[in-house]
Design a protein with these regions (language model features):
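Conserved adenosyl
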Residues: 1-53, 58
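Short secondary-structure boundary segments
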Residues: 1-9, 13, 67-79, 239-241
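A mobile, often basic/glycine-rich helix-loop segment
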Residues: 37-88, 136-147
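Long, Lys/Arg- and hydrophobic-enriched amphipathic alpha-helices
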Residues: 83-241
Length: 241
């Protein structure tokens, strides 16, 4: 099963996976009863966020409006009534807090399925634990640009607060948050890469080495990307985590 909201990407996936039996779904409720293996790779970073800014008189929502005929950030005039949570404690004026409203129902659905039927969910994304600050970003052609430039033409995302995912899966066992590079090394990626490199030459070998570095090196995806697993309680932790 694949959950994809973009019609354009669905067409691309269908072309790439035409030799396989795949069913596209609109939501997790369409997955039939039974144990699941659910992989969320760079899924949660794409979900919408709400941002809140701490000002002298309290918290205000960060909004987008028009200034000098261009998109610009601003804040709501009305102060918000904020419940005391970990997100909003130990903050000072000017701090920004990000909340993903859709995380709770999605993770609750995933954890309920795993708790009842068994299985595992592996979440791979860039982020951290107890995340605070402004992480809203835009990428176009592998370059970071102003998120308010070229609306509709760029990849918008924000870092994932893995602690929020864990809090909404309290009925399951949660693995330690592990760097992607550490996990891949524990699973033997370097040994496997060396074996594969023996049959490669020229540009193929160069690309192979670059791909290994990109996935594992601390200055690339190795540390930026984190991995967390959700399992039934009393389960044995999977290899590498």
């Amino acid at each position: 099963y694949l959950l994809e909201v973009s019609d354009k990407l669905k067409l691309l996936q269908k072309s790439k996976l035409e030799d396989y039996q795949v069913e596209w779904i609109e939501n997790l409720n369409q997955i039939p009863p039974g144990p699941i293996i659910l992989i969320a790779n760079e899924f949660f970073d794409s979900l919408p966020i709400n941002q809140y800014v701490k000002e002298a008189d309290g918290w205000h929502e960060r909004l987008i409006g028009i200034k000098d005929d261009k998109l610009a950030f601003g804040t709501s005039e009305q102060k918000l009534k904020i419940q005391s949570t970990d997100y909003f404690t130990q903050t000072v004026e000017g701090d920004i807090v990000e909340i993903r409203p859709s995380v709770e129902p999605i993770i609750t659905e995933i954890s309920n399925k795993i708790s009842h039927w068994g299985g595992i969910s592996l979440i791979i994304d860039y982020g951290s634990w107890n995340l605070k600050g402004n992480t809203f970003q835009a990428i176009k052609g592998h370059d970071f640009i102003n998120p308010l430039e070229k609306p509709g033409e760029v990849d918008l995302s924000a870092h994932v607060d893995f602690s929020a995912l864990a809090r909404n899966a309290s009925n399951c066992l949660i693995s330690k948050l592990t760097d992607q590079g550490v996990l891949l090394e524990r699973l033997g990626i370097t040994e496997r890469a060396k074996i594969l490199s023996k049959s490669l030459k020229a540009d193929d070998l160069k690309n192979h080495v670059a791909a290994h570095r990109r996935l594992t090196h601390p200055k690339e995806m190795g540390t930026l990307f984190k991995v967390m697993a959700i399992l039934p309680k009393l389960s044995q932790m999977p290899l590498g985590l």
